[in-house]
């Protein structure tokens, strides 16, 4: 007799999440830790890479809705987290970084999204490319599977290429340093506006020469995910197609403001 897998926990409709902790990631980025406003803890189950849709009623004359990928991972019990980077002219991102404080409540709907590792459809080597705040889903994914590599339902190997402007913009850097020490995890960081090659960084945008170097030998057994600026993602997809990677093994996520 088999035991049925319990259905994921999920609240119907809009829920209220309370800010329980705020971390300064960089000069323009903050991570907000959220728990259920009534019962504490994380009130839902989710898959690394999914997002929440949030409604803000006090920013303007009309309610404003935005979606943000969770930067926390399901294996981190008791909370969920959003990592918010200021966007020039971005109404919500700037308001959150300037005004959201401990004890405030945020309305949320979800979790939602399919930008996740799917063991039934993806190859065993997961290769990811992110830039700036586009690293957040990948921090969640790498953290979730780092201690499960090779097990059922997890990739066997993970490679993450992430681009930042400078060392002042290193979002989730302590996590990435720790995760890069895990066997089977490879994290490569490039800085586009600062040359720190003497410290182990690459230098420049993740364009064709860099992609050839970092992704060499991955094309036959890998699935690819990318999140960041549209131009970067388009070039990444075109490059993978030139290497005869099937389109079903290329997955994209686009961030708005």
Regions found by a protein language model. Give the residues of each.
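Reductase modules of NAD(P)H-dependent flavoproteins
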Residues: 9-13, 157-257
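Short, conserved phosphate/pyrophosphate- and ester-handling motifs at nucleotide-, phospho-/glycolipid
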Residues: 49, 134, 229
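A short, basic/flexible loop-to-alpha-helix module at the beginning of a structural domain
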Residues: 110-121
């Amino acid at each position: 007799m088999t035991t049925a897998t319990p259905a994921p926990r999920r609240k119907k409709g809009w829920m209220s999440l309370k800010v329980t902790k705020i971390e300064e990631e960089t000069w323009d980025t903050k991570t907000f830790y959220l728990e259920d406003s009534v019962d504490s803890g994380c009130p839902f189950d989710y898959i690394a890479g999914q997002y929440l849709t949030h409604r803000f009623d006090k920013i303007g004359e009309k309610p404003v809705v935005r979606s943000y990928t969770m930067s926390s991972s399901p294996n981190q019990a008791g909370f969920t987290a959003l990592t918010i980077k200021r966007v020039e002219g971005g109404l919500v991102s700037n308001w959150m970084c300037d005004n959201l404080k401990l004890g405030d409540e945020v309305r949320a709907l979800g979790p939602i999204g399919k930008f996740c590792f799917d063991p039934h459809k993806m190859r065993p080597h997961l290769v990811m490319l992110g830039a700036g705040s586009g690293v957040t889903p990948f921090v969640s994914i790498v953290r979730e599977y780092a201690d499960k590599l090779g097990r059922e339902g997890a990739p066997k190997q993970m490679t993450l290429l992430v681009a930042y402007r400078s060392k002042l913009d290193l979002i989730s850097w302590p996590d990435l340093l720790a995760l890069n020490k895990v066997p089977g995890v490879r994290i490569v960081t490039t800085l586009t506006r600062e040359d720190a090659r003497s410290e182990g960084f690459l230098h420049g945008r993740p364009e064709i020469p860099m992609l050839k170097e970092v992704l060499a030998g991955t094309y036959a057994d890998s699935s690819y995910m990318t999140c960041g600026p549209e131009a970067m993602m388009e070039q990444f997809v075109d490059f993978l197609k030139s290497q005869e990677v099937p389109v079903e093994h290329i997955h994209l996520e686009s961030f708005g403001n």
